[in-house]
């Protein structure tokens, strides 16, 4: 699979270079690089040279897109290799009822509050309902 991917990638590079070359060779009123080699006339490939270059460019661009999509299909990530299932299984194994097991910060806070000595009058105010003198 890797060898096929490398071969298609190499072919894609060649097609890219051909597309660039063909686009540069096409003349637009004799201004392009094609005019430099043929003196501005369209007689390099006969009377239909522009249509030949244009059609060849279309074919190469189509080949470029086809190879690009095929290469993307070859190199796509696999659907589900079991990694998702393994992660879900691990999560299920380590899942705990969080409301029954408070975090360490809550336990520390509970211990600090239990060590806090409240004045007896304060406890009496709340416990017996007596008023403040």
UniProtKB/Swiss-Prot annotation:
GO terms for molecular function: protein-transporting ATPase activity. Disulfide bonds: none annotated. Signal peptide: none annotated. One of its GO terms (cellular component) is plasma membrane. Its main location: membrane. InterPro entries: SecG. It comes from the Bacteria. GO terms for biological process: intracellular protein transmembrane transport; protein secretion; protein transport by the Sec complex. It is a multi-pass membrane protein. Keywords: Cell membrane, Membrane, Protein transport, Translocation, Transmembrane, Transmembrane helix, Transport. The chain crosses the membrane at residues 3-23, 52-72. Belongs to the SecG family. Involved in protein export. Participates in an early event of protein translocation. This is Probable protein-export membrane protein SecG. The lineage of its organism: Bacteria, Pseudomonadati, Spirochaetota, Spirochaetia, Spirochaetales.
